[in-house]
């Protein structure tokens, strides 16, 4: 029997890893800078998934300047990025899939450089032949843009 699919595309947050602690603490830290206190981190779970900039605009009505300032807060890049955990059994799943001949890829709305750091941190980067994400410079602003860029070569 021939495999119907050879390439498998995974999201990062919520699929490979549970990013709740790092993302919500990062958002809490950024909001505190603006005098907004959120003590229950579960209130910030809607930030998991979409790009931070989009979420700050949607949930807090931030303008472009505030959004830029909020997403550039140092907490995530220094600490929050690693306040994250690999889902149980993920190593074994990825090993089984690659051993079975599948090509694995990651697509995320997170900046690609951060996604690569997370994959390296958990020791699972070697399983993936492609990591698509947004650019820190605003290029490839959506997950779909990152995927299209990767497919284009």
Would you name each region that the model predicts?
Residues 1-46, 61-62:
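Active-site neighborhood of HAD-like aspartate-dependent phosphohydrolases
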Residues 4, 79-106, 112-116, 141-144, ...:
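Short, acidic loop-to-helix structural element flanking the phosphoryl-transfer center
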Residues 24, 49, 53, 91, ...:
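Alpha-helix N-cap/helix-start and coil->helix boundary motif
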Residues 26, 40-43, 51-56, 114, ...:
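Hydrophobic alpha-helical segments typical of transmembrane helices
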Residues 30-31, 50-63, 118-121, 150-151:
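Helix-loop "lid/cap" segments that line or gate small-molecule binding pockets
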Residues 32-38, 99-100, 123-127:
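Short helix-capping segments at alpha-helix termini
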Residues 46-78, 88-98:
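A metal-dependent, Asp-based hydrolase signature
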């Amino acid at each position: 029997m021939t495999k119907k699919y050879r390439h498998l595309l995974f999201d990062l947050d919520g699929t490979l890893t549970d990013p709740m602690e790092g993302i919500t603490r990062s958002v809490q830290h950024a909001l505190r800078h603006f005098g907004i206190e959120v003590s229950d981190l579960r209130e910030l779970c809607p930030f998991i998934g979409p790009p931070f900039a989009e979420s700050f605009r949607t949930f807090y009505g931030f303008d472009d300047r505030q959004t830029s300032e909020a997403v550039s807060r140092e907490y995530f890049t220094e600490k929050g990025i690693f306040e994250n955990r690999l889902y149980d059994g993920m190593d074994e799943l990825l090993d089984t899939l690659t051993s079975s001949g599948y090509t694995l890829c990651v697509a995320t709305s997170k900046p690609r450089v951060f996604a690569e750091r997370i994959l390296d941190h958990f020791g699972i980067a070697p399983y993936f032949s492609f990591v698509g994400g947004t650019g820190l410079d605003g290029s490839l602003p959506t997950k779909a843009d990152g995927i299209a860029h990767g497919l284009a070569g």
